[in-house]
Amino acid sequence: MAVHQYTVALFLAVALVAGPAASYAADVGYGAPATLATPATPAAPAAGYTPAAPAGAAPKATTDEQKLIEKINAGFKAAVAAAAGVPAVDKYKTFVATFGTASNKAFAEALSTEPKGAAAASSNAVLTSKLDAAYKLAYKSAEGATPEAKYDAYVATLSEALRIIAGTLEVHAVKPAGEEVKAIPAGELQVIDKVDAAFKVAATAANAAPANDKFTVFEAAFNDAIKASTGGAYQSYKFIPALEAAVKQSYAATVATAPAVKYTVFETALKKAITAMSQAQKAAKPAAAVTATATGAVGAATGAVGAATGAATAAAGGYKTGAATPTAGGYKV
């Protein structure tokens, strides 16, 4: 899933942010292009326009485009809240129905108050096309998935798209995964260093295996290393909701991939989640304590590598299930 999100972010950075130079002319303070006989000069900002707010404050929407994207973001959050209250198999259709209603209302209100003029029309058309592209990309990412996984795929893609679009308009949007991870209860963060160490052990074991066996070796090694580094209390790591969701999402991302690339997909997806958690933990406690915990975990987990590699065909313990049902982890709002 993380691999997919990185791809989405790169694609959207080009497809959604790129566009005609005059797309956001009003926002950056320039008027219509000057004629050949007249040098181009900056125009005065539109009435009521204010620059982006300082870091840490939520920028206030002032332009029509900013107001529209804020309404879209509000609809997104309302849809996530609605989906949270229904069974997993109904989350996707609930989200789509709720978000669709909110989006249609936002667009209708925008059209009813749309200012006249070629520049404004061009700017609104560009924003509308970007939002349309975001919806289509999110829908495409969810095609062919199970009802449970479809919701996660759709929301993950759409949240990235809205975040990038809102960023170009200097207004707040859905929080990125790295920020959301910080919401993990402090009491559970002590396990993250051990999980990080287990990941490194499993990756080392997988790197020495043939391409077609890397995924299976990594699964078995990761499972055994988790057990070793937590003193046998394997289930304790499952009490970290974000990690549990990340593991399931990472596994779901590999279902339709070839054996030779399954390992890369899974490893990259899980690495992103664990790295974000580790960074959040390091910011929350002294560096010395982090180093001591991580070093001890690596030593305990290393002993599991030999056995894990020899049992490359073993099932992936507690986190590999017959039908992965990822939960909305990194893109909670």
UniProtKB/Swiss-Prot annotation:
Belongs to the Poa p IX/Phl p VI allergen family. Residues 1-23 form the signal peptide. The lineage of its organism: Eukaryota, Viridiplantae, Streptophyta, Embryophyta, Tracheophyta. It comes from Poa pratensis. SUPFAM superfamilies: Group V grass pollen allergen. Sequence repeats lie at residues 309-320, 321-332. Keywords: Allergen, Repeat, Signal. This is Pollen allergen KBG 41. Residues 309-332 are annotated as: 2 X 12 AA tandem repeats. Its C-terminus might be membrane-associated. Pollen.
